[in-house]
């Protein structure tokens, strides 16, 4: 078999392959012999049909089948021989497939980039440290109480944070407009759910009162027909309800699946969850900085096939997440290109770090991570057992642990600055990660 390779770009290869005619004819004859054993042709007993008849009837199909199989087999043999690592399926261009001649075809494909990860010493990482103070815990308890607020009807005038039940009719230029009317709407004043001025116009209103509120739709309002226009809403207040925060008692604790009957026990459980969240937030911020540093220090070209695959995967993911009657291919590629490129480049760089430093998932760290996740459940031992019985889930944890080991490897060579911050600053969402160039 003859093979020649042309580098048409940094990652694209144009490979010409010639398969000897003898091998081609052997493959064709092999298929014809198999066909002869099972062919049913009038006037002949099964398995007794003369080969010239078989060849006349089935040679074209046998040759086409042999072509497909030989292209696949010889392409694989060629990339092994040439030590190439394709990043996707090849585009095949037949050149010659005449009877008695060599089979010639061209395979065009991309290869994975070959590179060595470098510049780890140039990466700067700010590693945060924080503690869950009593004040942080108190704030969290108030947040939990507010999330479980109930409303009780009152006979006073409405004020911010009250919930009102309203009917309303909106008009623009004296005409009722689509989507501008509703009945029985529950609205918490001050929530910012309605357009500016609407909720303010109900402060001071009582149950049974009708008010006319004049507002202007924002210039950037999603409905372009209404953007920037003045509107008049006639609003009837059906009821006014005041917020009532739940007591910190056993009934409240039970809503969170916590069996503790004392405030001290509940606070201890909440603190434990906050500390878990804190550890994860700090770890995530360190990881993002490491990944950004790896990207900046190792600019690499990415195979188009990998990018296309990742874009398509993100499209499918978006449709599954947001639903709607839309097909993944209808979503613009531009929406996902930047994210897809970052993920593909990081995937290649992380894989190379694993290879260069000969990293393998640490079983002790795998166990530690599973125990950490299981601690959030009431029956942690059952969760741990489930992970170790489920190969797919266990492998996912092993992948995460391996990625953490990559981060640890980089941190050993990077410049790391430790900084103490408040709990609030530590758990604050990080800025969007940098895009791959």
Curated annotation (Swiss-Prot):
Q: Name one GO cellular component term.
A: cytoplasm
Q: What class of enzyme is it?
A: isomerase
- Cystine pairs: none
Any one Gene Ontology biological process term?
chaperone-mediated protein folding
| InterPro entries recorded | PPIase_dom_sf, PPIase_FKBP_dom, Trig_fac, Trigger_fac_C, Trigger_fac_C_sf, Trigger_fac_ribosome-bd_bac, Trigger_fac_ribosome-bd_sf, Trigger_fact/SurA_dom_sf
Which UniProt keyword terms apply here?
Cell cycle, Cell division, Chaperone, Cytoplasm, Isomerase, Rotamase
Job description of the protein: Involved in protein export. Acts as a chaperone by maintaining the newly synthesized protein in an open conformation. Functions as a peptidyl-prolyl cis-trans isomerase.
Protein name (Swiss-Prot/TrEMBL)? Trigger factor
Q: Which organism is it from?
A: Pseudomonas putida (strain GB-1)
